[in-house]
A protein has these predicted regions:
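Short, well-ordered alpha-helices that flank and scaffold nucleotide-derived cofactor binding pockets
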Residues: 14, 18-22, 44, 78, ...
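Rossmann-like NAD(P)(H) cofactor-binding subdomain of soluble oxidoreductases
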Residues: 36, 45-138
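Internal alpha-helical scaffold of NAD(P)-dependent oxidoreductase catalytic cores
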Residues: 38-45, 121, 138-230, 278-279
Length: 281
């Protein structure tokens, strides 16, 4: 069984680490986070691995997962490459072995963020599961059937695909130059949805709708909209004043929302324009 070291073990790292441990695909070895306490919590959740908060403590591994925030991927790769170079000069073996695979979990950034590790002969990739990792325990139950975008060196993606297949995801290839737009699609599909739901609930609350009825409104409309989109597609599922060309109501309603919250008013106008364009398509 191949070993994996995990650097940065938040919600994504913990979910994937536990899934691979439970499925006996990877042997979770070392788990590195900024805080030893958080590393220990991650190890406890995964049921495997050794917690550390020092690069110098990391041991050789076949696979390295950098599950750190996007803004920290490049600097983490630099630090790891520097540490690996110093290890290679000492009595310790190269921590990745020849050749190791290193991948990060960003949906927006390409595997080129890991470029410093290429000097070690490592193969590089990125792997992005299209799943909301709001809670690792819940995410574990949702991995089955979820899509996973793989990008990077062919040898690395070829080796990673069986790992993600084992935990139930469905992999597909993605070109590095398309990652930003691809991830923006995911942001529109899921990340903005809670924002829109929160705005709707605020509007209902400030309109005097009782809390229990607002919750019922939210549940009914959300389920109805999702069901229609999945069954009919976005164009046929679209309803509302912009979709039916009621520009007068869109204007009046937009002004009312802008008075209530200027930023929400701008969002209303922008989304209404997009809705009208979609309806006309």
């Amino acid at each position: 069984m191949k070993s994996i070291n995990i650097i940065g073990c938040g919600r994504v790292g913990k979910t994937l680490g536990r899934a691979w441990h439970s499925s006996n695909f990877y042997r979770v070895q070392d788990v590195l986070t900024r805080s030893l306490a958080s590393a220990e919590q991650a190890v406890t959740f995964m049921g495997a691995g050794r917690a550390t908060n020092s690069l110098a403590d990391l041991r050789p591994a076949d696979v390295w997962m950098l599950a750190v925030p996007d803004g920290q991927i490049a600097q983490t790769a630099v630090a790891l490459a520097q540490a690996a170079a110093s290890w290679a000069k000492s009595d310790r073996p190269n921590p990745g072995g020849p050749p190791a695979i290193a991948f990060h979990c960003s949906g927006a950034l390409a595997s080129t963020e890991l470029a410093p590790l290429r000097s070690l002969g490592w193969q590089l990739a990125s792997a992005h599961c299209l799943l909301s990792f709001a809670d690792p325990g819940t995410a574990l139950q949702q991995l089955e059937g979820s899509p996973c975008a793989l990008e990077g060196d062919p040898s690395a993606t070829l080796a990673l695909e069986p790992a993600f297949d084992r935990i139930g995801t469905r992999c597909f290839p993605l070109a590095a130059e398309h990652k930003l737009l691809y991830h923006a699609g995911a942001v529109f599909a899921t990340n903005f949805l809670p924002v829109l739901q929160d705005l709707a609930q605020q509007l209902w609350r400030d309109s005097g709708v009782p809390a229990d009825m607002a919750a019922r409104l939210n549940t009914t409309l959300l389920r109805n909209a999702v069901d229609n989109i999945l069954a009919l597609g976005p164009v046929c599922a679209l309803t509302g004043p912009a979709a039916r060309g009621d520009t007068a109501l869109v204007q009046r309603q937009g002004e009312a929302v802008a008075q209530w919250n200027p930023t929400a008013g701008k969002a209303y106008q922008a989304l209404s324009q997009l809705a009208a364009k979609l309806a006309a398509s």
